[in-house]
């Protein structure tokens, strides 16, 4: 299955949602840059986010456009670290402390620049914090890369859910309850769920409407 992302709304426009499957483009990036497993996981998470919102980060850089084209590189592609306390790739340790900068060129005289500190280095949590503090948009960001023992990419993808201004307390509560019970995004992908199925699982009871599907690729 080729990589792609979808855009959707739910709860009569009170929720905006994006979901993507990015295994092929993350594997392409891994092979192109000869990255270690933890570097692949870090870069892959940000590449996945880039297909949905286009960030740029020092040391780990991704650029993306509205057509689903994305590219990126790692400042230290050979970084190797032991697993974290949960036995997972230590992406937070590899990314370290720093600043997340998001630069958006939307056709104005100057690009929009938003910047926040890295709160964890796990990337999804950092982007959630960025949306809340820099863009004042309550969001849930989930990103994941699952590696094979042969250092190839088994699964990659993610989703972004955002509450729109004026979202009701009922919608907020329902979304929070659903998010709390979700499996990791790589587990959902490894079970054969595509982006549509993932958003259906999260927002199917809230009037999910899929707006469009966009192919994504490393370029």
Per-region residue spans from a language model:
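Interaction interfaces in information-processing and related assembly proteins
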Residues: 2-212
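Local cysteine-cluster metal-coordination motifs and their immediate loop/turn environment
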Residues: 218-219
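Flanking scaffold residues of small Cys/His-coordinated metal-binding clusters
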Residues: 215
């Amino acid at each position: 299955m080729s990589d792609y992302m979808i855009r959707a709304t739910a709860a009569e426009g009170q929720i905006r949602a994006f979901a993507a499957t990015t295994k092929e483009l993350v594997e392409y990036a891994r092979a192109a840059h000869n990255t270690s497993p933890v570097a692949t996981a870090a870069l892959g998470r940000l590449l996945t986010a880039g297909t949905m919102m286009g960030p740029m980060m020092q040391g780990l850089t991704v650029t993306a456009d509205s057509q689903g084209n994305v590219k990126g590189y790692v400042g230290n592609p050979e970084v190797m670290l032991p697993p974290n306390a949960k036995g997972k790739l230590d992406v937070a340790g590899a990314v370290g402390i720093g600043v997340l900068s998001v630069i958006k060129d939307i056709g104005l005289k100057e690009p929009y620049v938003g910047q926040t500190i890295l709160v964890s280095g796990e990337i999804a949590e950092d982007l959630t914090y960025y949306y809340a503090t820099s863009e004042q948009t309550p969001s849930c960001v989930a990103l994941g890369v699952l590696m094979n023992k042969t250092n190839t990419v088994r699964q990659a993808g993610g989703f972004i859910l955002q509450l729109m201004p004026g979202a009701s307390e009922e919608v907020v509560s329902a979304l929070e309850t659903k998010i709390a019970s979700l499996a990791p995004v790589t587990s959902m992908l490894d079970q054969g769920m595509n982006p549509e199925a993932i958003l259906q699982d999260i927002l199917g009871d809230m009037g999910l409407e899929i707006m469009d599907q966009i192919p994504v690729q490393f370029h």
